[in-house]
């Protein structure tokens, strides 16, 4: 892997959580189905986009890696609204199938330089991709803390904040420090 593969990226973590709507209902088998449905619906928002570099799901977390071109920042900031629409669709589907669960999500976004490291195992298994830098770790840490109810459900790091235009920065005026990570959220 050459150092020339280093590029500006936007790393986004979406951490899903479920809430029981009925006290005596324990649908352990349905949570993977709900996550699959969410991921399928989310992927539909990216079909016409060329800036999605990678998407990975790890149980209740989805990591998106977008190319850090200027228009990707604008799109990334619309993701909370798109995720809300996706959650509404999934929850309506779950209600129709009597899952008695509701999905919610926490979203964290970071930006910076990164490059993909590919691990090839065999010809039949797609390569495993890891991204250099701390961006995936930071957004994952943030959404883990957010899922515990310690902050708003959508945060951007200072690294992403400083790449935004002043007019957009003014919308993200509330400052948070979570695990020594400087973050902002939109005014409520």
Range-by-range predicted roles:
Residues 1, 146-188:
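Intrinsically disordered, glycine/charged-rich C-terminal tails and inter-domain linkers
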Residues 23-25, 117-122, 167:
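Short, conserved acidic/polar surface loops in the N-terminal third of protein domains
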Residues 41-45, 82, 89, 93-96, ...:
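Amphipathic alpha-helical regulatory segments at dimerization interfaces
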Residues 76-83:
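Short amphipathic alpha-helices in soluble, non-transmembrane regions
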Residues 111, 122, 132-162:
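Catalytic/regulatory signature loops of cyclic-dinucleotide turnover enzymes
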């Amino acid at each position: 892997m050459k150092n020339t593969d280093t590029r500006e990226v936007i790393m986004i973590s979406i951490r899903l959580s479920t809430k029981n709507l009925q006290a005596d209902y324990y649908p352990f088998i349905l949570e993977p189905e709900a996550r699959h449905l969410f991921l399928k619906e989310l992927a539909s928002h990216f079909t016409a986009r060329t800036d999605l570099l990678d998407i990975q799901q790890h149980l209740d977390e989805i990591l998106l890696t977008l190319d850090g071109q200027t228009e990707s920042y604008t799109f990334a900031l619309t993701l909370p609204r798109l995720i809300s629409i996706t959650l509404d669709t999934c929850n309506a589907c779950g209600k129709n199938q009597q899952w008695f669960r509701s999905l919610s999500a926490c979203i964290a976004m970071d930006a910076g330089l990164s490059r993909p490291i590919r691990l090839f195992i065999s010809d039949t298994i797609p390569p495993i991709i890891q991204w250099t830098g701390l961006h995936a770790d930071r957004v994952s840490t943030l959404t883990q803390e957010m899922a515990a109810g310690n902050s708003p459900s959508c945060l951007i790091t200072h690294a992403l904040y400083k790449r935004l235009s002043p007019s957009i920065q003014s919308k993200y005026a509330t400052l948070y420090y979570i695990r020594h990570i400087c973050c902002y959220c939109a005014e409520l």
